[in-house]
Amino acid sequence: MTVDWWTIGLQVINVSVLIWLLSRFFWRPICAVISRRQQEIAAQLAQVTDGQKQLEADRAAVKEARSSFEQERARIVQQAQQEAQSERQAILAKAQQDAAALEAGAKQSIAQEEAENQARWRSDAAALSCDIAGQLLAQTGCCRPARETLFDRLLKAIATLPDRERLSLRDGFTFATATAPSPDERQAYESALMTAVGEHPVITWAVDPALVEGFAVKTPYLTVASNWQADLVRIREGLSHAGH
């Protein structure tokens, strides 16, 4: 068998040229496309990875926000419960205070009403007692020594008046008696009154049965009394205020 080295050489050259052509105009573009595609795929994978990371971060943020919301909700509910409890306690305390105030006011009103009733009863009882005593004294009359005592007391009351009031009696006054005096008694009373006043005033005589027994010196601005009616009034006032 004969080997044609020129043919083999030409074939080798052809194959080498073909390989060079393929590598230059076919494999390189294909490799470039494959490389570019690989880069795009890697970029997309990186984007997917970043997206997954972002999604995980978003999920974590949502979870954290949800946890924060739950904590805030629990805090708000607890605060609302505390405020409701505080308001309830305040309402109960206010109601208790109002009830205590109403009770105290009612007790005070009842006590005041009882005191007023007792005072009215004492006043009515004292007035009735003094009216009965006055009627009995008016019916039984007065003995001369008692009348003289009442007149002496009148003179002492005039003597103890302030100077201005006592001197005003010199301008004249009304001398009231429970019963009409006899001429001798009238003269004695007039003489004693002039001595007590210090001059000779004009005396207007009057009979006032309401005095029960005794005397009264009266001017438009002054009254000096020494009679049972005045004594009964003082006794009645004393009895009316005895329980105060």
UniProtKB/Swiss-Prot annotation:
It is a single-pass membrane protein. The chain crosses the membrane at residues 2-22. The keyword Ion transport applies. One of its GO terms (cellular component) is plasma membrane. It comes from the Bacteria. It is found in: Cell inner membrane. One of its GO terms (molecular function) is proton-transporting ATP synthase activity, rotational mechanism. InterPro entries: ATP_synth_b/b'su_bac/chlpt (IPR002146), ATP_synthase_B_chain (IPR050059). The keyword Transmembrane helix applies. Keywords: ATP synthesis, Cell inner membrane, Cell membrane, CF(0), Hydrogen ion transport, Ion transport, Membrane, Transmembrane, Transmembrane helix, Transport. Its main location: membrane. F(1)F(0) ATP synthase produces ATP from ADP in the presence of a proton or sodium gradient. F-type ATPases consist of two structural domains, F(1) containing the extramembraneous catalytic core and F(0) containing the membrane proton channel, linked together by a central stalk and a peripheral stalk. During catalysis, ATP synthesis in the catalytic domain of F(1) is coupled via a rotary mechanism of the central stalk subunits to proton translocation. Component of the F(0) channel, it forms part of the peripheral stalk, linking F(1) to F(0). HAMAP family: ATP_synth_b_bprime. F-type ATPases have 2 components, F(1) - the catalytic core - and F(0) - the membrane proton channel. F(1) has five subunits: alpha(3), beta(3), gamma(1), delta(1), epsilon(1). F(0) has three main subunits: a(1), b(2) and c(10-14). The alpha and beta chains form an alternating ring which encloses part of the gamma chain. F(1) is attached to F(0) by a central stalk formed by the gamma and epsilon chains, while a peripheral stalk is formed by the delta and b chains. Belongs to the ATPase B chain family. This is ATP synthase subunit b 2. It comes from Gluconobacter oxydans (strain 621H). The lineage of its organism: Bacteria, Pseudomonadati, Pseudomonadota, Alphaproteobacteria, Acetobacterales.
